[in-house]
């Protein structure tokens, strides 16, 4: 075959290749199209950057934090064939504006439910372990962002950047995000957590920190479905009445509600019945309040250690901000609509990596997804996304099986016990300094 015929064959193959075919094993193209239609984001004009493929640009933007947007589009090769081999930077920005944030939010919500239901999570007494917690995001200092996201003030002084407040719900054994809500700094975390009540499934136990202590919120959380339990530290100075003793450091208690809480939460009664556990951890006495009042089904001896798993969501935030975002604290987007789009894309990309880690953990006996390296898995998924575009359709299932079987490469070693006591060393100086002269005693 002559070189001209080979180039012509490659050109014809590239013009007929549909990017959705190769990336469809990660995100269902029909699901993306359905989310675009539900959000009202449609276009009649055939563009080189289709809205379906711009969702992948948002995912790549979260995985490749240091790369410009047009470089991500070119590396993923998600544009349709045209006269120019590459896409202009301005075209990517215009495509992001056409896409908006609602479509990306719907893609995240639907995939979170789909992947969560498809994963066989381990249970505790028939309950799935969840946790909610808040996180702040810093946006670029532009007039549009400043107007949409008010700054937080400290002692009357405004913060340096506009900020977004977000509350996420995470399944603790797989680190899959199941729901999220965000607003401005004027919104409290309790207000954002209230938006997650309807998205919480039945037969779950949600671990919360003391910032979410609100009897109205906790009561609404329990009444929203069947066996939707919660556990939270008891607020300091909270008044309660003991009903009966269930065991050592285990009591059934009754807490009175305030008129303000009953006015805000119509379904809240004058009293709330809960279970109070008193546990000692590292020499410190802790009081935990929970809705699991059935002492026969939920043993109190195990519940004290159960709350320590809430820290998994903090580790998940560290994976997102430090590993995936490369510790770049400020988002890219300079307009509020694109800020929301970028945040939904970050959560979608994190879940995408985590779901692939779940698939890899299925090939490892005795390993859970949170025992695999997130940073290695994150780079592996991005490399696979770029590899799929150049692969023939027949090899795509083989490549996906290879990725699922690569769990041996990302296993974390067993954490060793500390051999020496912790030592805080002096910070190294850039330039040598003269030793301090000893002061004479007068």
Swiss-Prot record:
InterPro entries: RNaseH-like_sf, Transpos_IS4, Transposase_11, Transposases_IS4_N
GO biological process: DNA transposition
Main function: Involved in the transposition of the insertion sequence IS4.
Family: Belongs to the transposase 11 family.
Stated name of the protein: Transposase InsG for insertion sequence element IS4
Parts of the chain that traverse the membrane: none
Organism of this sequence: Escherichia coli (strain K12)
Domain of life: Bacteria
Pfam families named among the record's database cross-references: DDE_Tnp_1 (PF01609), Nterm_IS4 (PF13006)
PANTHER family in UniProt: TRANSPOSASE INSG FOR INSERTION SEQUENCE ELEMENT IS4-RELATED
Keywords linked to the UniProt accession: DNA recombination, DNA-binding, Transposable element, Transposition
Molecular function GO labels: DNA binding; transposase activity
